[in-house]
Every structure is written in C-alpha cells, then in structure tokens.
Amino acid sequence: MDGPTRGHGLRKKRRSRSQRDRERRSRGGLGAGAAGGGGAGRTRALSLASSSGSDKEDNGKPPSSAPSRPRPPRRKRRESTSAEEDIIDGFAMTSFVTFEALEKDVALKPQERVEKRQTPLTKKKREALTNGLSFHSKKSRLSHPHHYSSDRENDRNLCQHLGKRKKMPKALRQLKPGQNSCRDSDSESASGESKGFHRSSSRERLSDSSAPSSLGTGYFCDSDSDQEEKASDASSEKLFNTVIVNKDPELGVGTLPEHDSQDAGPIVPKISGLERSQEKSQDCCKEPIFEPVVLKDPCPQVAQPIPQPQTEPQLRAPSPDPDLVQRTEAPPQPPPLSTQPPQGPPEAQLQPAPQPQVQRPPRPQSPTQLLHQNLPPVQAHPSAQSLSQPLSAYNSSSLSLNSLSSSRSSTPAKTQPAPPHISHHPSASPFPLSLPNHSPLHSFTPTLQPPAHSHHPNMFAPPTALPPPPPLTSGSLQVAGHPAGSTYSEQDILRQELNTRFLASQSADRGASLGPPPYLRTEFHQHQHQHQHTHQHTHQHTFTPFPHAIPPTAIMPTPAPPMFDKYPTKVDPFYRHSLFHSYPPAVSGIPPMIPPTGPFGSLQGAFQPKTSNPIDVAARPGTVPHTLLQKDPRLTDPFRPMLRKPGKWCAMHVHIAWQIYHHQQKVKKQMQSDPHKLDFGLKPEFLSRPPGPSLFGAIHHPHDLARPSTLFSAAGAAHPTGTPFGPPPHHSNFLNPAAHLEPFNRPSTFTGLAAVGGNAFGGLGNPSVTPNSMFGHKDGPSVQNFSNPHEPWNRLHRTPPSFPTPPPWLKPGELERSASAAAHDRDRDVDKRDSSVSKDDKERESVEKRHSSHPSPAPVLPVNALGHTRSSTEQIRAHLNTEAREKDKPKERERDHSESRKDLAADEHKAKEGHLPEKDGHGHEGRAAGEEAKQLARVPSPYVRTPVVESARPNSTSSREAEPRKGEPAYENPKKSSEVKVKEERKEDHDLPPEAPQTHRASEPPPPNSSSSVHPGPLASMPMTVGVTGIHPMNSISSLDRTRMMTPFMGISPLPGGERFPYPSFHWDPIRDPLRDPYRELDIHRRDPLGRDFLLRNDPLHRLSTPRLYEADRSFRDREPHDYSHHHHHHHHPLSVDPRREHERGGHLDERERLHMLREDYEHTRLHSVHPASLDGHLPHPSLITPGLPSMHYPRISPTAGNQNGLLNKTPPTAALSAPPPLISTLGGRPVSPRRTTPLSAEIRERPPSHTLKDIEAR
C-alpha cells in the first residue's frame, strides 16, 4: 500500500494494515481495484469505489471496486497532496455546492457513476477545478466527473458526487429509515434529505467524534437513540462484523456495505463509512478522493475521505505528525469548508452545515452516541479487530478523519485534528467500538493514547501524553479491541446506562449540549473518545448541575444529577446554596459563579478539568479509565464521596457552627447590647470560620439560607434568628468586624453579614432608610420585618444578610448622628473647620446610614455603634433636622468654599484627583485625619469610617478638600492616616475596589472596612468609592443605597453585576445617570459642595427620595463642606459656575429628580416595606455573589462591607462607614465614583457615563 511511503511511523502501521487490505482486496476483488492500475487505475479505483458507493445506492457495484478504490486514492494522495487539499476544497465545495446538484446526482448517480468509473482520468481533469471546480464540476462531475485533471480530485469529486448520490440515497435511507440512526436527520431531518443527511453525517462524524465516520450516520444516530442505537448497532455490528469479517477481503467489505447500503440504508452507510474509512486509511493517499465520496456516501465516509486526502498525503510526509498533518490539513480543510460553502453551498452545507448540526445535536447526542458507541464497539468488535489490522490505515484514516473532523468541526477542532475520534471514526462503529473495542484501537488509544490524537496531543494535554501510545494503538488497540470484547459487556452495560443517562440528561441538557458541542468536540477530538467518555461521564456527574458548564453538561449531564443528588442532599442547605444558591437564583452571573465555585469545581475538578480528566484517564489503565470513567459514579465516589463527606460535614459543621455562633451571638448580644466588639470578635470566628469550612461564606450563607429563617431571620433580626434576637444586629456589627477579621471567611460568613444585615437591616439598614427600621433592627422587630423579607430574598439571594449589615452602621451612625446633629449645629456655628468636623460626624452618620449594611462600626467602635444604634432613630431624626438645616448652610458654605477655594483647590484637587498628589493630599489628608481624629474622638464608633470616608473622599475630593482644612492642625496626627490614605487612595485609583479599602485602612485602624468599602459600602461612602466605585465600587455603596432603594428589583441584578460589588450589578441605569447621578448627588454632597448643593438644592430628589440620605449628605457636607467646598469649589466651582456644570446640573437635576422620584418611591417602599427586600436586594448580590464567586461572596458582604470587612478586618468600620453611603448612594444613586476624586466637572462628565469619574479617579 502507498500508506507506508506516506506515513513513516504511523504509516507503517497503515502499511501493514494496508497490505492486509490489499490482500483482502486481492481476495475480495483486487482486480476491480487494480483495474485502475497506476494513478489512472487508482483514480479508476476511486471512481469505481465511488461508483461502487453509487452502486451501493443503485446496485452494489462489485465490492472489488470498493476495495480497489481505497488503495488507488491513497496513491493519488501521495501523488498530489496539495491537489488533494485542493480537491478536498473542491470536493467539499462540490458536495456542498451540488447539494442540489447532489440530489440531481442522486438521479444521475448510476450513469454518472458509470461515467466516473469509465473516465477516472477525465475526472483528474477536474483537478483544475479543485476549489472552484466543485461548484462548476458539480454537474460536470455528474455528467463528466472526468473533466478534472487530478485523479484525486476526480476521484474525490466523483466520490463526492457518487458519495453524494450514494450518500444521498443512503442519507435518505438513513434519514428516512434510520432517522433514529441519523441524528442529523433528526436535526435536519430531510431538509434536502441528502443535504440533511450530509450534514447529519458530517455532524455525526464531528459530534460523534467517536463513531461518526464509518459508523456514520446510522451508527452515530444509533448512539443517539438507545433502543434504535441497539437495533442499529446490532445491525451495524452485523454489518460491521460481516463487513469487517469481509474486511480482510476488502471486496467483501465493499460488497457487504454496498449491498447493505441499500439493504440496511442507515447501517450500510456505517459499514460503508467504516469499511471505507478503514480502506481509506489503508489507501489514504489513493482513496482520499474516493473517501470523501465514501464519507459522503455514508456521511462518515465523506468526512473521512475529505480529511484523508489531505491528511493522508501529509501523513505520508510525517508519519509521526499525522495529527500535525491533520492539523495542518485540517485547517486547510476548514478553509475548504469555508471555501466550499461559498463555492458549493450544498457541499458547504454538507461539511460546514454538518458542523453546526454536529455541534447542535451531536454534542447532546455525542455523549449518548459515545456511550452508545461504547457499547456497540463491542458489537463492532470484529470491525474493531479488523480495524486493528488496518489500524495503521485507521491511524492514517483517523488522521485524515481528524483533518476532516477538523475541517468539519473546523470551528472547534480546526487545528485540532481532534476528530481523531473521527479519524477513529473511519469506522464510526469501530469508534464506538473504539470505546470498548475501538477504544482499544481508537477510542482507548484515542482517549488514553489516541493514535491520531497522539499526533495532535497539542490540542489537549492528555492527548499529548496519549500520543506516545500510538504504537499501542495498532498493537494495543487490537488487544484492546479484544479486551473490548470483555469490556463490551461492561461497555454494553455502560452504553445502556450511559445512553440512558445521556438520553435523560441530554433531553434535559439538550440545549446545554448544544453549548458544549464545540467544547465536547474539542474534548472528543483531543481526548480521544475514551477521554471524551471519561469527561462525559465525569462531567455528566460533575457538571450536570451547572448549566453554565454546558460543555460538561452535555458530557456529564447525567452523572451530575447523582452527584448533586448525593451531594446536595447531604450538604443541601450548605452546598445547595453555595452551588445552587448561585445557581438557583438563576441570576445571569450564576453560571460563571458556579464554575467559579472552586470547591465544586474541584469536586468536579477531579474530572472537571479536561486535562485532569485526560490525566486521570491516561494515568489509569486504558481500560480502567473507561471503566472508572464510564462508571464515573465510582470515580466520583472516590472523589465525590470524600468531597461529599467533607461537604456534608462542612454543611453540618457549618450549620452547627452557625447555630452555635448564632446562639453565642444571641447571648453576647443580650449580654452586650452595646459591645459589638465582643460579638463581632466572636462572630468573625464563627462566621468566618464556618464560612471557611464551607466553600465560602456563600456556603455558610447558603447554610443560613438553607435555614433561611434563622440565617435570614438572623440576617434580618438576629443573625442566628435575627428577628428574635436583639444581638443579631450587634452580630451584624460583629459580622462586619468578623468580615474585616476574615475577608473571605467574612464573605463566607455572609450569614454573619446576614446577622449584620439583620443588625444593619433591622437596626441600621432599615433605619438608614427608616429610623424605625434602625430601631427595629436594634430591637429586633425590624429584624423580623427583615427576616420576613430576608427569608424570601435571602433564600433566593442571600444578600439580605449583607444588606442587613448596613443597618448596624445606621445604629452606630444614629448615635453618631445624634452626636453629629449636635456636632453639625456646633460645627455650623463653629469655624467651617469645626463644621467640617461635625460634617465628618454627620458624614459618618450618613455614611453609616449609607453603609448601615456594613457592620464596620462594630470593629472600630462597637460600643458606639450600639449606642448609635440605640439612639440611631433619635439621632437620625435630629441628624435629619440638622442636615436639613445644614443642607442649606453647607450648600452656601460649600459654595463659598468652592468659589473661594475654587481656584486653589481646583488645581490641587484636579492634580490630586489625577493621582492623589500628596502635596495637597498630605495637607488635606492631615486635615481630614484631624477631622477624623476629632470625629473618632467624638464618635469613636464605626465612624472611623467617617475619617475613612473623608480620607476616601479626600482621596477623591473630600480628602483633598478636607485635607487642606484638616491638614493644618490635625495633619500631624492623621498624617499617618493621610499618608496611608494617600496610598490607599492611589490604590483606589488603581485598584478601585482595593484602594478605597486601603484608604479607609489608612485613615481607619481597621482597613478591612476600607476594603469593604472598596467593595461594598466604603466605596460609596468614601470619595474613593467615587473614583473607585465609579461603576462598581461606587455602585457598591450606591448599590447599597440603590439596593435599599431598589433592592427589591435590583437585589437580583446586583449579584450579576456585582463582581465584588454586587451593587454595580445594580446596573439599572441608576448606576449610570439616573441612579448614578442621584448617588453622585449624595457623593457630590459629600465631595462636591457644589454638587451637594446642586443635589441638595434638588431637594425633591434628596428630600423626597432620601431625606435621611440627603441629610446624611448634608451632614457630610456640613462636616466636609469645607473639604468638599474647598476642593469641589476649587475644581468644582468652575462647574458650578460653569455653564457646562450648570447645564449638566440642570440636566442631571432633572434626571436626578426623576431618579429621586423613583428613588423616593423606592425609598418609601423600601423604607417601609421594601427595605427588607431592599436589604435582601442588597444581600442578593452578595448572596448570589457569594454562592458562585468568592468576590461575589464578598459582594454579598461587600455591599454590607461584611465581605469587604472580612477582607479588611480593620476597615470594617470604614466599610460600615462606607455602609452608610448606601443611603447616600440611595440618594446619590450614582456609584461612589461620583464621590469625586476628580473635579465636579469631571464628576458631572462622569456622572452620565459612570466611567469618566472612575477613570479619572483611577488616574
């Protein structure tokens, strides 16, 4: 056989097999094949083979022509590899172009078949039409296939046409009689039955990377349908057995398939494809042209021939690189696919269209088919053995099929000749055999040591490792083929089991399967079929639950249910929420979250990683992997049971830990209504710890969610059972401290956040929106209210716990606000600097209101936080009054400041905004630190965040504005903070999320709050949030407020949007101009005296939507009006005076008024009834975030600053401080970014885009 010359290493095997085939052909009817003698003889053989394919259709022509046709095509391939490629292109084009023509060819088949046989040389003439030829030559071929100059092209064209004609009848038969067999026919039942069949065959080849080619449509389809699979498999196996038995005499194969082609329409194509694939493998170079026809005849054969012509010629050159050749040629073939569709729509449909189909149904079915093929392979075991003889041919054919598959699945496997499955498809049935029988030959070898895959191991790491066994492929494959017999019973069982699973899972995951097809195709092609099966099984078990992991879904949809049935049931509350929580919420971001679910990814990861699976498969004995993988449950059992045990233990442990923790928190809360430190300290341990055991706080939260009443009642009222316990609010604060204690554990302990949320929610979150809620939070009545909303929301989103976190901030904020109310009056009376201090206090209060979800105050000033919580209602009311008064004064003051400092601060602030310049930054930071120190002294509670807010704000605006003021006396003290702030601010600018926390950390003893701020509240609370959270960070806090305001409807959105900042997910355009501008209003109030004045002047927005928030803003302005006025007047005054700014103000004001109207509705609803949901809305992001992503876990806390606090344990107060910003955010829906680090002009510019300020601040 010519194969030896073509493929040296691999080809040698083919040589032996091809020699065997030659013997068979000599026995069966070599004369017919030899009639072609030389290249012409080969062409003739090809044409004869093609015609024999046509004869199959009409009258099985001498099988000898079939055997002879394979050999001559191989020689032809050798003769002209490039021509083959061209022919392949032309061939593909011809097939596609002449899809209609192919139908015509079906009519013309007998005559044209004869003509083609008669004039194979004339067919060569068509070579000139290699690419364009297919289109023109379609009919030309039909009438004069000889016109092509290249024998290969001629043969290929003839084969294509004949194959089309034959294939069309076969396809029609398969489609009609074997629609069950022909998955493609199912997909494209008979849109042009031949066309549908071509596609189906191509798709089958592709999707059935295992047994598409020779097994072709019939067998592939058989794989698709279990019963029919078995029936078709039986018949195809009979055909294969007969054909393979006759394969030794190629004539027998040809005859049997040809006759069977007519007799067993769907099955014969399999045999035809299998036999031809084998024969083609043997006569890769000669038969490539014919092979395409054959592949097209029995869809699989068409796929094989097409690649083989290219691959085979290349295979000749590099036997070890057949895969590379295939890859190389596969890309050319894909181009032909591309070329063919344009030139030959029918052919293109045949190949590219089949690809889509292959991707569509084949993926879903490819698992079933793979499974089915796993079973039938034994049936086709004789074929597998026979194939093992021509394994070299198979390798060649497989490689060629790889090329073809690559071309066919050029999308997924262009460069991957990954269709080694298809290459093993040469006997599609054998490929299913390949799993059991061919598995040894092609599937095992493909999977563990893919002969073709070994060539393109590059495509996959496992294949790379697998390539070495190609020799095993020929020798071991045969042996494996025999073991396949023993495996067959197992595989038959597996086939039934897996087919059942696949059918069940595919029915459910058909859509998901469609998604995975490319992935599966790659996997199939890369990890030979066995690997695919392993992955399928593994993935089925592992990924079925995750629609987002659709590729695995298609592969492992079925096993996954058991895994989750076993796993979720055990860890139901825990993991279901972690995995399913993110997943059940059905949030758009969940699918990613689920894969991110590292723990489960790891659980599944044992088999999930394609590389890991291949490694597992490769590491395991060739057959074992199939057994293990096929019995994926077993594999999962070793891994999953352990995981399940830990998971179950984790779930139980976390649950118990949470219960204990809740109980302790209750006790502590009861014991220390004021001392949040103790509770938060405990809470971090329990909350952080249990979350640690759990995959994430998400899991714990899921746990809490699992016991949503407790968790979300706890989140709402007391963390354990928030409603009943007063401590939960403190726990909420504690949770925030816990959050800052353990950033991730914190996030993990979103339950803690839930408790914090209950605290923040009942006491702070709601109070931030509604003082009563704050009070209720403290008392626990609000908590119950929150619990009710939390339970619905928390179960769904688990974010409520984090949203409840804000209320605790309100608690401390309230104390501080009462103090701040006096401080505001006092500061108003006092110098503007004092006013800034009081503003800082009020800012803290407002920030706490905004960041009420953040338990941060607890870490810094837990007692104060409690005290604040106690007096939060009174303080809020006084603060509101004070802020109402201060709204005007700060406005004017800030106006004055902005105008007076406009020139000075405009440049300084701009420069600082550019990169937090420390020249003014230090002065401002010093002042801010001084104010912070004063504020901290006054309100030792979480208001540390106020400094943080100021420092963050100074980072954006306040820090810089307040820094000059504060910097004078307090600069020395706060310089540390200021410097740290500067660092943090820079980080703010660079790491939007981190910087805010860092700034907060710098300004505050607990940076975690800052971090929390960065993620959730602090961003909004902090000016940094303005810059950092421009979209997300700002959105975090704004989102907090937004969540509170719009949480009910935004609660879900935050999760998807909120990476770490669930709020950003509050992307309802509030983040942008509408809400964002309102948020910016608050931030502007804090940061931009003018902006604040502007926003506050828009009292309809502020007063109506968030009087509290606006008053908090006013307090911010009163506290930081100098800072803000200073800087903002410096660089904002231009805006305020700026017609641009005035215009923007007007536009934004209108927008904000509109938004505020919405917000008012939201506020009122949320304050009264929605607030719990709003808290939930807040939690949903984190909760949703927590389940899937750690960052999302943070977001859950992050909104609450719980996660942020967890990350930045020290900053939780800052986070809490930034927690109030949600209120501000509520008012200033704009993301924290509006908190201007940049001039108001920039802020205004950024307000609508929501990116400008972020970008500017980032700068």
Curated annotation (Swiss-Prot):
One of its GO terms (cellular component) is nucleus. Residues 1-87, 108-285, 299-470, 771-1027, 1119-1146, 1217-1259 are annotated as: Disordered. The keyword Plastid does not apply. Residues 8-17, 136-147, 1125-1134 have a biased composition (Basic residues). GO terms for molecular function: chromatin binding. Pfam families: Auts2. The modification Phosphoserine is found at S1198, S1233. Residues 108-118, 148-158, 276-285, 813-850, 876-935, 960-993, 1243-1259 have a biased composition (Basic and acidic residues). Disulfide bonds: none annotated. The keyword Lyase does not apply. It is found in: Nucleus; Cytoplasm, Cytoskeleton; Cell projection, Growth cone. Keywords: Autism, Autism spectrum disorder, Cell projection, Chromosomal rearrangement, Cytoplasm, Cytoskeleton, Intellectual disability, Nucleus, Phosphoprotein, Transcription, Transcription regulation. Residues 289-472 are annotated as: Important for regulation of lamellipodia formation. Residues 177-192, 436-447 have a biased composition (Polar residues). Component of a Polycomb group (PcG) multiprotein PRC1-like complex, a complex class required to maintain the transcriptionally repressive state of many genes, including Hox genes, throughout development. PcG PRC1 complex acts via chromatin remodeling and modification of histones; it mediates monoubiquitination of histone H2A 'Lys-119', rendering chromatin heritably changed in its expressibility. The PRC1-like complex that contains PCGF5, RNF2, CSNK2B, RYBP and AUTS2 has decreased histone H2A ubiquitination activity, due to the phosphorylation of RNF2 by CSNK2B. Belongs to the AUTS2 family. Component of a PRC1-like complex that contains PCGF5, RNF2, CSNK2B, RYBP and AUTS2. Within this complex, interacts directly with PCGF5 and CSNK2B. Interacts with the histone acetyltransferase EP300/p300. Interacts (via Pro-rich region) with PREX1, DOCK1 and ELMO2. This is Autism susceptibility gene 2 protein.
